[in-house]
C-alpha cells in the first residue's frame, strides 16, 4: 500500500533536551513538499558530532530534535519538482548539500553549498518549517538529515542516488566519517607518493585519513593518539608508527619529538580530534617551508586556535576541510563504486551494531573509547 502523500507514523530516537539519553518515540513524518524527498532510512551510523550536539556544547543545537546524519535508505516519495531521485532509489543522505547553482557550488573552489545553510543551521527545512511532529510538538531536523528516524524528509539537494547493490549498512558510513577523512587526504591535501603524514586522533576519521594516505603512496604515516588501544587499529589501516604523547619520557615536547623523528617535520598533518591544543601541535610539527595542516575535527563552541605568526610566515599552511572536500551529489557514486571494487575499506570501521531501540548503547560505546563506528538497524 502506497504511503505517498500521507503522514507516516514511525519510530524515531528523539532528543528532548541536551545531556539526556535519546527517547524512542512514535512520531509523525509529514509528506515532502516541493523539492523535498521522503526517505525510508534503513541504516544509520552514530557519529561524535551527534554526541557533541546532544551534550549541549553546540551553539547551533536546538531541541527537541531528531539527530543522525550518516544515513542510507530508499526513496519513499518525492515532492513537486524533484528530478534527481525517484521512488525506490537507493540513496545516501548528505549533510553537505550540493545545489550546483549557488556562488559556492559554481566557484570550483569548494564543496560547501550556501543554498540552504541558513535554515539547515536552524534545524529546519528550506521553507523554514519542520516535517516531524511528536506529542503535539514540532521536532527540529539535524544537519539536513535526521537519520535517527525510520522515515525522514530532506531537501532534494541533500540526497544522492547510489548503486542498488551497495549494502546500506556500509554506504551510510560514506555519509560522513569515512568520506570525511579519506577525502581530506586525497582531495584537500592531495597527498603525493613519498609524503610524510601525521594523523592526530585515530578514530573513524583518523583511520580514514590513513587509508587515503596509503592509497596515495605516503612513505611515513605516523599516528598520534593518547589511547594505546588505537595502535592496533592504526596498524591495520596502514600506519607506519604510533606515538602516545603521554608515554614519552618526562619533559619531552611532542612537537620537537615529531620534528626530530621525521627529519624536519611532516609534509601534511591532520587534526581529527577537535582539540585546539592538538591543532596547534599538528601545525607546528609540519615541515618548515611547505608543511600543511588540515583541521577536520570540530572544536567546542567558543574555542579558538592560536600559534605564533612566524609559523605561517615560514611557510606552514593551516587549512580546514568539511566532508573531505567531496561534492556529495557529484562524487558519492564513484566513492561507493570504489568501495564495491575493494579500493576503500568501510566494513572494517564497524565495531558495534544495535537496533533503534538500543541506540543509546551506541553513544555509551562511543564514550567508552573502544568503538570506531556503531551502525543502527532502523527497521
UniProtKB/Swiss-Prot annotation:
Q: Name one GO biological process term.
A: formaldehyde catabolic process
The prosthetic group or cofactor this protein requires is: Zn(2+)
| Positions annotated to bind NAD(+) | 48, 201-206, 225, 296-298
Residue numbers binding Zn(2+) 2: 99, 102, 105, 113
- Which UniProt keywords are present, listed alphabetically? Metal-binding, NAD, Oxidoreductase, Zinc
Q: Which reaction does it catalyse?
A: a primary alcohol + NAD(+) = an aldehyde + NADH + H(+); a secondary alcohol + NAD(+) = a ketone + NADH + H(+); S-(hydroxymethyl)glutathione + NADP(+) = S-formylglutathione + NADPH + H(+); S-(hydroxymethyl)glutathione + NAD(+) = S-formylglutathione + NADH + H(+)
Which Enzyme Commission number(s) are on file for it?
1.1.1.284, 1.1.1.1, 1.1.1.-
Q: Which Pfam families match?
A: ADH_N (PF08240), ADH_zinc_N (PF00107)
What name goes with this protein? S-(hydroxymethyl)glutathione dehydrogenase
Organism field: Komagataella pastoris (Yeast)
Amino acid at each position: 500500500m502506497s504511503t505517498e502523500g500521507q503522514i507516516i507514523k514511525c519510530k524515531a530516537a528523539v532528543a528532548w533536551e541536551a545531556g539526556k539519553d535519546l527517547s524512542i518515540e512514535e512520531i509523525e513524518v509529514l509528506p515532502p513538499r516541493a523539492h523535498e524527498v521522503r526517505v525510508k532510512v534503513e541504516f544509520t551510523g552514530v557519529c561524535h558530532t551527534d554526541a557533541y550536539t546532544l551534550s549541549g556544547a553546540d551553539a547551533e543545537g536546538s531541541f527537541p530534535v531528531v539527530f543522525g546524519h550518516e544515513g542510507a535508505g530508499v526513496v519513499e516519495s518525492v515532492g513537486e519538482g524533484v528530478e534527481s531521485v525517484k521512488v525506490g532509489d537507493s540513496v545516501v543522505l548528505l549533510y553537505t548539500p550540493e545545489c550546483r547553482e549557488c556562488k559556492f557550488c559554481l566557484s570550483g573552489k569548494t564543496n560547501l553549498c550556501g543554498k540552504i545553510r541558513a535554515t539547515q543551521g536552524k534545524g529546519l527545512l528550506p521553507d523554514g518549517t519542520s516535517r516531524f511532529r511528536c506529542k503535539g510538538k514540532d521536532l527540529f531536523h539535524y544537519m539536513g538529515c535526521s537519520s535517527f528516524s525510520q522515515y525522514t524528509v530532506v531537501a532534494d539537494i541533500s540526497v544522492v542516488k547510489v548503486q542498488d547493490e551497495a549494502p546500506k549498512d556500509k554506504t551510510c558510513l560514506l555519509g560522513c566519517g569515512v568520506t570525511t577523512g579519506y577525502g581530506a587526504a586525497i582531495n584537500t591535501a592531495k597527498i603525493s607518493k613519498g609524503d610524510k603524514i601525521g594523523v592526530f586522533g585515530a578514530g573513524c576519521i583518523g583511520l580514514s585519513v590513513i587509508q587515503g594516505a596509503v592509497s596515495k603512496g605516503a612513505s611515513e604515516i605516523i599516528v598520534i593518539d593518547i589511547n594505546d588501544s588505537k595502535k592496533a587499529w592504526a596498524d591495520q589501516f596502514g600506519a607506519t608508527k604510533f606515538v602516545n604523547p603521554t608515554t614519552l619520557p618526562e619533559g619531552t615536547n611532542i612537537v620537537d619529538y615529531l620534528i626530530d623523528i621525521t627529519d624536519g617535520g611532516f609534509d601534511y598533518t591532520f587534526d581529527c580530534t577537535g582539540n585546539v591544543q592538538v591543532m596547534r601541535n599538528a601545525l607546528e610539527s609540519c615541515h618548515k617551508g611547505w608543511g600543511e595542516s588540515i583541521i577536520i575535527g570540530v572544536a567546542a563552541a567558543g574555542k579558538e586556535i592560536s600559534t605564533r605568526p612566524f609559523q605561517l610566515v615560514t611557510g606552514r599552511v593551516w587549512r580546514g576541510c568539511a566532508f573531505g572536500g567531496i561534492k556529495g551529489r557529484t562524487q558519492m557514486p564513484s566513492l561507493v563504486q570504489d568501495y564495491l571494487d575493494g579500493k576503500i575499506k568501510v566494513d572494517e570501521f564497524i565495531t558495534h551494531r544495535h537496533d533503534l531501540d538500543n541506540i543509546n548503547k551506541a553513544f555509551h560505546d562511543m564514550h567508552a573509547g573502544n568503538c570506531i563506528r556503531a551502525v543502527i538497524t532502523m527497521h
